[in-house]
């Protein structure tokens, strides 16, 4: 599976997992992140993650179900 690239702005050193879920359309609102993460498996660099505030940096790989994303 080829990960979809998520590009950070130059003034943005990271994004949170909750923001990633929202901008990719996996959830509709930021408030849904907590519930989504409690009920679904999300991997960050191959390890399970359930914190919506997890900071994602350049080079991180995220897998949500059959979807994959890379932070660039």
Question: Residue locations for each model-derived region?
Answer:
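A basic, amphipathic helix-loop patch mediating RNA/tRNA/ribosome contacts
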Residues: 15-55
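A detector for short, charged/polar N-terminal pre-domain segments
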Residues: 2-15
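Short, charged beta-turn/beta-strand-edge "cap" motif at the junction between a beta-strand
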Residues: 66-71
